[in-house]
């Protein structure tokens, strides 16, 4: 698997609310690139390309961070580590990039997507999810963007645990194999009576 996407950024000068606010007014988002060697490089990223790559890559998919300095461009494989948003606008205020070594494993929280309508729900049960993320470890380019769990065959009192996941090759879960992700429970008598009263 190859790295398919690149985000071009520039090194930035100035720290604190004043300089960061001026950057955001220019639709540039302040951020920090944490290199695999433990160095911190302050960068500024254009808002629209950043938003697009975040929507495509999330926190799980590696892309190249191309840093421009003094007319020279250098690309580093990274994951998006942490993102800060405006309190009421859907706009970035700060972003952290985590540099990875493609030959070394990383551990990432990967979204779990539940699909289908279970047999148990059709019989009156309730689908109860316990986790929306699962912690996985693999080399960066092997990390899945999400894990899809089909609940169609789940009957009442059935549970899908971490050990039931069909993970890609060379990817392992960091949770206990018996850790429950989703179950179908029967409605309690009180719930059934409440629904009957509403009818």
From Swiss-Prot:
UniProt key word rRNA-binding: yes
Q: Which InterPro entries match?
A: Rbsml_bL25/Gln-tRNA_synth_N, Ribosomal_bL25/Gln-tRNA_synth, Ribosomal_bL25_b-dom, Ribosomal_bL25_C, Ribosomal_bL25_long, Ribosomal_L25_dom, Ribosomal_uL5_bac-type
Q: Name one Pfam family in it.
A: Ribosomal_TL5_C
Please state what the protein is called: Large ribosomal subunit protein bL25
**Which gene carries the instructions for this protein?**
rplY
HAMAP family in alphabetical order = Ribosomal_bL25_CTC
From the UniProt entry, list the residue stretches annotated as the region Disordered: 1-21
Q: What species does this protein belong to?
A: Desulfovibrio desulfuricans (strain ATCC 27774 / DSM 6949 / MB)
Q: Mind listing the UniProt keywords for this protein, alphabetically?
A: Ribonucleoprotein, Ribosomal protein, RNA-binding, rRNA-binding
Similarity remark:
Belongs to the bacterial ribosomal protein bL25 family. CTC subfamily.
